[in-house]
A protein has these predicted regions:
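Charged phosphate-binding loop/patch that engages nucleotide di/tri-phosphates or the phosphate backbone
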Residues: 175-198
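Active-site-proximal specificity loops/subdomain of glycosyltransferases
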Residues: 1-56, 65
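Generic detector of well-ordered alpha-helical segments enriched in charged/polar residues
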Residues: 42, 160-164, 183, 187
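Conserved catalytic core of nucleotide-sugar-dependent glycosyltransferases
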Residues: 30-34, 61-177
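Intrinsic disorder/low-complexity signal
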Residues: 16-18, 128, 187, 197
């Protein structure tokens, strides 16, 4: 599959726009592009059966499928709790569990971005808002030891380039880091941003 179209919702940025409007539009446009690419996955699922299990991951999220019998899972949504690795394969952030890979049966899949947006907590039965929400669910199965999330396995220069071009690049445009500052962060074994915010 090749995704070579401009996604719906991308808007032009004009010279007359305020700084706030420009920042907002950069972020919204990046989100529309990322969501459009992710939703295009559905084109490759056209021939999948209704009971097929669909897993949606970013490219740096690897689900651990050992010891999982999907036939024994009755919940609607499956969330994989993944170990987080930063900068190097052996630099584990033990205090952060990443819920990256998410899964459901094809019959329940609204679209890939919907699955990605599902909140990573199980809501109690008395939360009536879950009956009307498209991202809050009660029927969730957590897979502990659910895999690995390897992020920013790059040099400081490569991370600098990534930060200028990915979804949240506007934050970086407004508060940039130099390659030397990123190198210092790597050497201190710190995350670039507060990963608990998202």
């Amino acid at each position: 599959l090749i995704y070579d179209q401009q996604p719906i919702g991308v808007k032009s940025i004009n010279n007359k726009d305020t700084d706030h409007e420009i920042s907002s539009q950069y972020i919204f446009n990046a989100g529309h592009r990322e969501n459009g690419q992710r939703n295009y996955i559905a084109e490759g699922l056209a021939n999948a059966d209704a009971d097929d299990i669909i897993l949606i991951s970013d490219v740096d999220e690897i689900p651990n499928l050992d010891n999982i019998n999907f036939q024994n899972i009755n919940e609607k949504i499956i969330l994989f709790k993944q170990n987080m690795f930063y900068y190097k394969f052996n630099l584990h952030l033990p205090k952060l569990i990443w819920t990256g890979t998410k899964s459901c049966k094809k019959r329940d899949l609204l679209n890939p971005q919907w699955l990605r947006n599902v909140k990573d907590r199980k809501y109690p039965f008395f939360r009536l808002d879950t009956f009307f929400s498209k991202n809050k669910y009660q029927s969730i199965k957590y897979i502990n030891d659910g895999g690995w999330h390897f992020t920013n396995l790059k040099t400081a220069k490569e991370i600098h380039f990534k930060l200028k071009s990915y979804l949240h690049h506007r934050e970086f445009d407004v508060n940039p880091l130099t390659v030397d500052q990123i190198n210092e962060i790597i050497n201190d074994k710190r995350a670039i941003y507060n990963l608990n915010v998202d």
